[in-house]
Regions:
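Membrane-water interface at the C-terminal end of transmembrane alpha helices
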Residues: 81, 102-118
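Hydrophobic alpha-helical membrane segments
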Residues: 66-81
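Structural signature of hydrophobic alpha-helical transmembrane segments
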Residues: 34-44, 96
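Intrinsic N-terminal pre-sequences and regulatory tails
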Residues: 1-7, 11, 112-122
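Membrane-helix boundary connector in multi-pass membrane proteins
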Residues: 79-95
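Membrane-helix boundary elements
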Residues: 11-33
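Membrane-helix boundary/interface segments in integral membrane proteins
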Residues: 46-59
Length: 122
């Protein structure tokens, strides 16, 4: 069941940006782990503000493209956890969990808004 509406997904996206941009300070990340997390946060912010949904600002990336990017990023972040951060248990754990959360959000989002449109009565 796709129970996350496009609007709620937009809220989640902005919360993810805040989470990513505050994680290095909150969790004490340094070096590559901190830098990578900031870059991912900025990329996610750009994707979020450019997406064509209620909470987007510039609205030129279709929500279906946003969906595909999130699917790829979720998988890629888990792969990165085991490659780029293979010797950093903190980074590995962070990106396995974060990638999994991205994939679950992708899985449960109604990107077409089909289940969340108002039913018109005649």
């Amino acid at each position: 069941m796709k129970f996350i509406s496009p609007t709620i997904h937009g809220l989640i996206d902005y919360l993810v940006v805040v989470f990513l941009l505050t994680s290095p300070a909150t969790f004490g990340f340094t070096g590559l782990l901190a830098g990578f997390t900031y870059v991912i946060g900025i990329i996610h912010l750009l994707l979020t503000i450019c997406t064509e949904y209620k909470l987007g600002i510039f609205k030129f990336i279709p929500l279906t493209i946003h969906s595909g990017i999130e699917l790829m990023m979720g998988v890629l972040l888990i792969v990165i956890a085991y490659t780029l951060f293979s010797n950093n248990s903190e980074g590995k754990l962070f990106y396995v969990i974060f990638g999994t959360v991205i994939l679950l959000t992708w899985l449960f989002t109604d990107y077409k808004g089909i289940h969340h449109k108002k039913v018109e009565t005649t």
